[in-house]
Amino acid sequence: MDTKLNDKKIVKFKRIYIEITNVCNLNCSFCSNSNKVKREMTPEEFKEVLSKINNYTDYIYLHVKGEPLTHHNLDKILDITKEYNKKVCITTNGVFLKDKLPILKKYDNIYQINISLHSENNKKNYLEDIISSVNELSPYISYRFWTLDNNKMDNKTKEYIKILKKVYNKEEIYDGIKLKDKVYLSLDNKFTWPSINNNYYNERGTC
């Protein structure tokens, strides 16, 4: 989709990712290490970024590696997305989902929340808290299990799938299944962050 600004044709992207924080409350083995200084984007910095990309997309993804729900000014960040009329997608490990419900429920421009259930954590009642939180949310929800090894589930994934089947009254679970209105499940093999130091990488790719 193209748009025009000052008689110049501008390419419009389906989505743009903005890392509002590179801080994460977990330390999962599948996430590559970074030597960057740990910090979060200030609301002023975020507004400047959004003003510069405003004409290039309608969808903002508040995630690259950090956990967006740890941001101390999450409400102000979401206020700015509302000001610029952007639809927001959030990817989270879900640990703070219940705590952040009062904030998340305020914004009708949150389009989708992806919950990475393959995260490595030992929080008590983790899945139960997420399921109860999802019942209070209105955006699209995607439960993510990106932990398959050659399409095979580990024991933790099997345990979670068993719970979800019972909660949503499903006899079987598969990638892309609709669990209920606006709630879906995504199954995929383990994600490997791209690097030229990997043993193998494709000569062709997409951006």
Functional labels for PLM-detected ranges:
Residues 1-112, 121-125:
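Conserved alpha-helical substructure of the radical SAM core
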Residues 41, 61, 75, 84-87, ...:
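Radical SAM enzyme [4Fe-4S]-AdoMet core and its adjacent flexible, acidic
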